[in-house]
From Swiss-Prot:
The gene is rplQ. One of its GO terms (molecular function) is structural constituent of ribosome. Belongs to the bacterial ribosomal protein bL17 family. The keyword Kinase does not apply. Part of the 50S ribosomal subunit. Contacts protein L32. Gene3D superfamilies: Ribosomal protein L17. Disulfide bonds: none annotated. NCBIfam families: L17. This is Large ribosomal subunit protein bL17. One of its GO terms (biological process) is translation. Keywords: Ribonucleoprotein, Ribosomal protein. PANTHER family: LARGE RIBOSOMAL SUBUNIT PROTEIN BL17M, RIBOSOMAL PROTEIN L17. GO terms for cellular component: cytosolic large ribosomal subunit. The lineage of its organism: Bacteria, Pseudomonadati, Pseudomonadota, Alphaproteobacteria, Hyphomicrobiales.
Length: 137
C-alpha cells in the first residue's frame, strides 16, 4: 500500500529521480525557465524552493549542502550570489508553474516552470556546447 507517500515515482528508480531532479534544478537556475511535463514540474518546485531558501540563509555548510543536492558548483554560485539576494524579501513562492498544453508525440501535459521576477535575458543562454570557429579564413 502506498498510504502516506507524498511524491510521485515518475516510472523511475530512486537514483534516476534524484539525478534527474538535480539536473533539472541546475537547468532551472541557469536559464530561470524550463519546459517539462506537468508532473515533473510539480515535483521539482519544492526542491527548488528549498534550495533558494538555503541560498537566502547563506553560509558555507548550506552552500555545501546545495552542492550535494545539485552537483553543479557554478549554478550553486549563481543561486547564492544572484538569486538569494533577489528573493531576500520574499517568503517562499519563488517559482511559478504555467500549463503549456500537450506534447504532440504522446499527449503528455506540458508546463513551464520559471522563477518569479526572473531575468528574461537568462533564458537560453549557453544552452549547449560551444564550437570554436576560426575567423582567420
Amino acid at each position: 500500500m502506498r498510504h502516506g507517500k507524498v511524491h510521485r515515482k515518475l516510472n523511475r528508480t530512486a537514483e534516476h529521480r534524484k539525478a534527474m531532479f538535480a539536473n533539472m534544478c541546475a537547468s532551472l537556475i541557469k536559464h530561470e525557465q524550463i519546459v517539462t511535463t506537468l508532473p515533473k514540474a510539480k515535483e521539482l518546485r519544492p526542491i527548488v524552493e528549498k534550495l533558494v531558501t538555503l541560498g537566502k540563509k547563506g553560509g558555507l555548510a548550506l552552500r555545501r549542502q546545495a552542492i550535494a543536492e545539485m552537483r553543479d558548483v557554478d549554478q550553486v554560485k549563481k543561486l547564492f550570489d544572484v538569486l538569494a539576494p533577489r528573493y531576500k524579501d520574499r517568503n517562499g513562492g519563488y517559482t511559478r508553474i504555467i500549463k503549456a498544453g500537450f506534447r504532440y508525440g504522446d499527449n503528455a501535459a506540458m508546463a513551464v516552470i520559471e522563477f518569479v521576477d526572473r531575468d528574461v535575458d537568462a533564458k537560453g543562454q549557453d544552452s549547449g556546447p560551444v564550437q570554436e570557429t576560426s575567423e582567420a579564413a
